[in-house]
Design a protein with these regions (language model features):
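Short, solvent-exposed recognition patches
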Residues: 75-96, 266-386, 393-401
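Short, hydrophobic/aromatic-rich segments at coil-to-beta transitions
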Residues: 64-68, 105-110, 184-191, 215-218, ...
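Extracellularly exposed regions in secreted/surface proteins, prominently low-complexity, repeat-rich
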Residues: 208-213, 220-221, 227, 239-266, ...
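An acidic-aromatic
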Residues: 98-158, 228-232, 379
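Gly/Pro-enriched, hydrophobic low-complexity segments
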Residues: 112, 175-259
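A short, Trp-centered hydrophobic/proline-enriched beta-strand micro-motif
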Residues: 57-82, 107-111
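N-terminal Sec-pathway targeting helices
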Residues: 2-23
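C-terminal region of N-terminal signal peptides and the immediate post-cleavage residues
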Residues: 6-8, 26-58
Length: 407
């Protein structure tokens, strides 16, 4: 594994972790092409907690449906996304990605994706999986990851939703706007925004929710002072009802090469080892007793943020957090060349694109790879046998200043 590859992967994973608050809560599209209801009656008035409860129940057990979807992003650079792609997986989201999706149940799914790097088709029917790569004219097929035998999940309760809202309340404001029409359907509009606008580059996140099925129809994340979303997921058409069974019977295209399905083409979450999640400890001194390298604290954190958390990762890495909520800055470190925040399943194939990331001089002969995006930035570097990753929803210049303070 090369130093640059490890640094870039660690940077990418940490940056995604920090920015994930916005993308995961994610949350709905630009209002272009939408209109408030005039002729139609507005949907039932719901409180925030009741609407969130219905969304959680609907996404946990969705009805059969077919939909046309478009995803766009201008957050991460194309070479990083292409480098982090996986063989047999979906095309990297370096440009608009259009997809047609048919869902017949937990083990019946068909997705046809159109991207700049060629079309892909993914089909699951029972335990059988097919993945077609139009650019290579290859089909990978085999038994997919089996359904896990787990007890039924507890239903979403008002208490659970209220607990979530209580956790969000100190740093975030959740509100509803006037209902709109999207994809010919009535939709609720939820808006999540940071209370401390100066602590983050994220302006707001929005979600449009279908008033009939309570499935999300659009998501978007907006950066500060930018009118267009930097990440958006949009459903342009949605048909709810039974899906023809023959859509889940994959027909191999003429001349296509058929190859065995590799487990690497399945979701990487299946590969995560036990203990992969960070474990919080009380102090830096306690963490220092458990690792074999010197833990560094930021002498000049961005925006004078205070140390708010100390975490052990995979037994040989440490993650320090500064600040809270949307403005959290993460400082990960561990023995090796930039692998402090890198999950063990990442492979060497990512190196080529990662080497193209820009570098900045931190002084003392140390250079860092840098990602700068509209909603956050990240640095990754190595010094004296220790890899470091610094990331947060702050300008890159603030991270550079904090990193130089370590010299």
């Amino acid at each position: 594994m090369t130093s640059n590859a490890g640094e870039g992967r660690g940077l990418a994973r940490s940056l995604v972790l920090v920015l994930g608050i916005a993308v995961l809560l994610g949350l709905a599209g630009a209002l272009v092409g939408m209109r408030a209801f005039a002729a139609q009656a507005p949907p039932e008035e719901l409180s925030n907690d009741e609407l969130l409860s219905r969304v959680a129940r609907a996404t946990g057990d969705p009805p059969a449906f077919s939909a046309s979807i478009t995803v766009e992003q201008s957050v991460l650079p194309a070479q990083l996304l292409e480098a982090s792609g996986q063989e047999g997986g979906p095309p990297a989201l370096s440009g608009p990605l259009s997809a047609r999706v048919w869902y017949g149940g937990p083990t019946q799914l068909r997705a046809e994706l159109q991207g700049e790097n060629g079309d892909r088709i993914f089909v699951r029917n029972g335990s059988r999986v097919w993945i077609y790569d139009g650019a290579e004219n290859t089909v990978r097929t085999g038994e997919g990851v089996p359904e896990q035998e787990t007890p039924d999940e507890e239903p979403v309760t008002p208490t659970g939703v209220n607990r979530l809202l209580d956790e969000l309340a100190p740093t975030s404001e959740l509100s509803q706007q006037e209902p709109v029409e999207v994809a010919g359907r009535q939709a609720y509009v939820l808006v999540l925004s940071p209370r401390d606008e100066g602590a983050t580059l994220v302006d707001r996140a929005q979600m449009l929710v279908d008033s009939e099925t309570y499935l999300p129809l659009r998501f978007a994340v907006y950066a500060d002072e930018r009118p267009d979303p930097v990440f958006s997921y949009q459903v342009s058409s949605l048909d709810v009802g039974p899906v023809p069974a023959d859509l889940f019977d994959f027909q191999t295209p003429p001349g296509a090469e058929v190859l065995p399905l590799e487990q690497g083409a399945e979701p990487r979450e299946q590969e995560r080892p036990e203990g992969a999640e960070p474990t919080q400890v009380e102090t830096v001194a306690e963490a220092q007793r458990l690792v074999d390298f010197r833990i560094r604290e930021l002498p000049d954190p961005p925006g004078d943020r205070e140390l708010t958390g100390v975490y052990l990762k995979n037994g040989d890495g440490v993650v320090l957090t500064y600040g809270s909520g949307w403005g959290t800055v993460v400082f990960a470190q561990g023995q090796g060349d930039g692998d402090a925040a890198m999950p063990p399943e990442a492979g060497d194939a990512e190196a080529n694109g990662l080497q193209q990331l820009p570098t900045v001089d931190l002084g003392g002969g140390v250079e860092a790879q840098e990602i700068s995006t509209p909603i956050g930035s990240g640095l990754s570097w190595s010094a004296d046998g220790v890899g470091y990753v610094l990331a947060g929803s702050v300008p890159a210049s603030e991270l550079e200043q904090a990193a130089r303070g370590l010299r």
